[in-house]
Regions:
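Glycine-rich phosphate-binding loop signature in dinucleotide/nucleotide-binding domains
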Residues: 12-13, 59, 113-120
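Acidic, Mg2+-coordinating phosphoryl-transfer loop and its flanking beta/alpha structural elements
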Residues: 110, 118-149
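Non-catalytic pre-domain segments flanking phosphatase-related domains
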Residues: 1-20
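A structural signal for isolated positions on well-ordered beta-strands in alpha/beta enzyme cores
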Residues: 62-64, 90-92, 122
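Substrate-recognition "cap/lid" segment bordering the active-site pocket of phosphatases
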Residues: 71-119
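Short, acidic loop-to-helix structural element flanking the phosphoryl-transfer center
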Residues: 34-64, 71-76, 104
Length: 149
């Protein structure tokens, strides 16, 4: 079988969780530049992704939000999430000043904080490079929008 697709095995002793990207996936930052952190409070909720995430949470999945946003905007990000997502979540953010690519940052967070603690049933992401990275880890990744940037 030349087209074998690697999928990570589940550990039945671990809780199930989903990974969800923020910008371009759950949060739509219309009218702001990516680094305009003072404006993220005005982002629109991508209601279709939010509906799926809420449904998975109701079925017992932990919701893990993983973003390339700098840690400096944690306050406004959690304020937006609490007002818009309205379910329990765990939030991982890029360390302040970390200039590495999103895929590098998210892979490191996954390896250090998430991989041995949860069965990741699904990942929601928009950026091609990050989608590819998740799939290389054997995770089912749903790409929610065009992400060639």
């Amino acid at each position: 079988m030349g087209n074998y697709r690697y999928m990570k095995e589940f550990d039945k002793n671990l809780p199930n969780a989903v990974l969800v990207d923020l910008d371009g996936t759950l949060a739509l930052g219309k009218g702001r530049e990516w680094f305009d952190y003072d404006k993220v409070i005005n982002d629109q909720l991508e209601f279709r992704v939010a509906h799926i995430v809420r449904s998975l949470q109701q079925q017992g999945h932990k919701i893990i939000l993983i973003t390339g946003r700098d840690e400096e905007c944690r306050g406004v990000t959690t304020e937006w999430l609490d007002a818009n997502l309205t379910i329990p979540y765990i939030l991982y953010m890029r360390s302040h000043g970390d200039k590495r690519s999103d895929s590098e940052v998210k892979l490191e967070i996954y390896k250090q904080e998430i991989e041995k603690e949860y069965n990741i049933t699904t990942v929601f992401e928009d950026r091609n490079k990050v989608v590819d990275m998740w799939r290389q880890q054997g995770l089912l990744c749903c790409q929610v929008y065009y992400g060639d940037f």
